[in-house]
Amino acid sequence: HVRSRRQRQMCIRDRCKCVKWRIESDVMGIVAKGDLGLSREDPAYASQGPAEKVYALGYSDKNVMPVIMIHVKNHIAATQPAETMTKFVISAAETFRTLVVYPNDKVIVVFDMSGFGMRNMDWHSLMTVLKILEGYYPETLAKLYIYRAPWIFQGIWKAVNPLLDPEIRNKINFCNKSDELDVVPQYICEDTIGGDQVDVVKWVEPQPGEKEGLDRNDPKRQEMWKSYRDISRDYEEVTKKWIISDGQDDRLNAERDQQSKRLRLKYIELEPFLRARSMYQRAGIINEDLLLQFTYKQKDGRVLRPVSYTHLRAHETEAD
């Protein structure tokens, strides 16, 4: 609830800035093309997934937040142009958003700096990530861990630190042991950083003919989009009344919550028409009904299988 006039003005300004960026960056075009379409257009993009630079480990116990692992040593800055990395960063950010479980809207990020050298240092990609986190996916980051940073990173950090928004800076922790990743359970931490999880799904190749998102002018997509917009207008109308009431009208509170659920469900229904398949669908982590399920193989031979999550509700983990 944005209370002051200044906050409202900043909110409107930032939202307009975000919409402008999404249009100029063709975010929806990127997610519609997916790994297959982007790789077809740009051979350098095709090497990003197989390099296993970034992937999701699973969910945290508290608040069910996706845990994103980034192996910096797997990124060789000179092997792809800046434009390719911009597309890859946007595609990864949008893909990880599909793993978010309502009502949580945040993710945890672990930068594994072990093996880092200057050939891995990519100012463009680093600044793109920071710019996106601060400006275009606000309040998305719950915590960011910089794991086993070598001494040569100290100079880089001194240059980067002043550029960070204070809210982002306060969410960054440096650590050297897996048990210092305090909001990431040990059974989710990868064995390469001292955790218990082995055989993590890091990359699954797209298959020829794999589904891509529909073109903006496709009649089916336009029909689904119109249906979504109709519900969004209903949500906007009740939200206007809710704002006037300052959130004090119980009937409007309930009506707005109901419209919010309708809107979220409609977008989940619409999403397959907007997005190409991601590696998490190819791996079966996101199934055809958009249920979410990670399987955690442990180094002691156990397999932990969570009850499926949905975009609307989360459940607890159980062991086999």
Where are these regions (language model features)?
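Aromatic/basic-lined ligand-recognition segments
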Residues: 5-9, 13-110, 114-115
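Amphipathic alpha-helical protein-protein interaction segments
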Residues: 4-9, 78, 82, 119, ...
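Short amphipathic alpha-helices and their capping/turn residues within compact interaction modules
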Residues: 20, 24, 94, 98-101, ...
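Structured beta-strand/turn binding interfaces of compact recognition modules in eukaryotic regulators
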Residues: 70-73, 114, 147-150, 175-177
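Alpha-helical bundle/repeat cores within regulatory domains of eukaryotic proteins
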Residues: 107-159
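Single conserved hydrophobic/aromatic residue that forms the stacking wall/gate
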Residues: 2-8, 12, 311, 318-320
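Contiguous terminal or domain-adjacent regions
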Residues: 154-313
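Surface-exposed, flexible loop/turn segments at secondary-structure boundaries
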Residues: 75, 152, 180, 320
